[in-house]
Amino acid sequence: MNKNTDGCIGIRILSPLTGTAVPLEEVPDPVFSQKIIGDGVAILPQDGNLVSPIDAEVVSIAETLHAYGLRSENGIEVMIHFGLETVALKGECFQCCVKVGDKVKAGELLAKADLKALEEKQVNTVTPVLICGGTEGRSMNAFTGPVKAGTDAVITVLDHCPPDGTAEAETAALQNPDGAPAANASSLTDTADRKTEKTRKSLIN
């Protein structure tokens, strides 16, 4: 976490991949570009090493190993969806390095993707990084440009600044960010693929 010059607390979401961060609106899938699941950013990866963007618990892993849901102690829920329509690969090209329930540190390896094999299959490897919950009462900034996995922030979630700027108020805001957990993060990865399929069918029809 970083403290901004105006006294607000910023929760830094690091890039899970080395590459280039681009606006979510540029992702050629309406489920992501229209922010149906959540807001965030997308990464054009240079390699397939997928790391955790935040200290968190692994709350969901897609059966096909292409998507990961995480929840931080502060209630921030993050979903990483490696590539588009990668659910159709049924786990091919992906190697999972964690299991549900694991506690991971920012920068810790979650999975490995065979980027060359994905490109040979003509899979679009653009990877949405979404904030799916825990942002109630908070604002969010996304950043674009070259990024290094586990080092450069791509999203900052800001708590509302305490009126008197006191450290006590800041601490209270962090310890009780929402009062209650957001949507069930354990279903995040499945929800993303169901909504993608539903949207795709509606576009066809």
Regions flagged by a language model, labelled:
Residues 1-178, 182-184, 190, 194-204:
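Contiguous, well-folded functional domains in the mature portion of proteins
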